[in-house]
Amino acid sequence: ETGFDCAPIEFPTSGVADFREPAMQVMDINGMSACECYYKDYRISNGKPKLKGLPATYATDDEAQTLEVFCYDPHSGLYITLMYSVFPKFDVITRSVKVENNGLAAIDLRRIISMSLDLDRMDYDMITLHGTWARERHVQRFPIRFGKQSIDSNRGATSHAHNNFFALCDHTATEDFGEAYGFALVYSGSFLGMVEVGQYEKTRALLGINPYDFSWHLEPGEDFQAPEVIMTCLLYTSDAA
C-alpha cells in the first residue's frame, strides 16, 4: 500500500494521484484543475480568531488555542491556511480553511471543503439525521461500505431533509460505550457531508460547502474563508464514569 491513493492526507487536492474525493479543486484561466498543497509554516496562538463574515464558535485566550498551518501551491500562487482551534474543556476541535490568491492571474475556486479526515480502517457505522417538513431530525444508522455515502443540500439552505451533521462510530457503540467521531458544519447554506471508503479499506470523511453549482472567482489579492466544522471524539470504556 504505497502512493497518494492510500496515504492519510490532511488537505487533499485534485490532480495529484489521490483519486479519492478532494477537499479543494480550482480552475485557472487555462483550464487547469490540478493543485498541489505544500507545507510552508505554522503558528500557535491563544484564543480563537474570528472568521470574516461567518458565524463561528468563540473563545477567550484562556479557553482555546489555535494552530494555523500555512500551505501554498507553487503553480497557481494560492496560499491555503488550515485553522484548528482546540477547546480542552469540551473535547472539541474546530476546523476551517482560508484560500488566498497570491498569484498573478485570476482563478476560480470550484470546491472548498472545510474538513477532511482520513481514518485507517473502515469498520464504522455512519449516523445521520434525516427528515422532512414538520418531521425533522430522525436518526439513521448504517455500516459504511466501499464507495461513497453522503448527505447534502443544494437548495441554498441546510434544509429539513438532511442535517449538516454526521457521526462515525464503532458498530457496537452506544451512548455509554464505544468510540465515536462527530462532525457539524456551522453554516446554514448548501452543504455536503461525505464518507468514502477506498480500495485499501481506509475511510475519508468530508464536510463543507456543497460543490454543486459552486464557483468563487478570486482575483489576485482576494481571499475566500470557508465555514467552520466542529469535531469531537468520544471514547467510552467500561471503566468510564
Give residue spans per PLM region.
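Polysaccharide-binding surfaces and accessory modules of carbohydrate-active proteins
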Residues: 1-197, 202, 212-214
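Short coil/turn motifs at secondary-structure junctions
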Residues: 102, 233-234
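Nucleotide/phosphate-binding site architecture used for ATP/NTP-dependent chemistry
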Residues: 205, 209
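Short Pro-Gly-centered flexible turn/kink motifs
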Residues: 216-233
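Conserved small/polar residues in nucleotide/adenosyl-binding loops
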Residues: 236-241
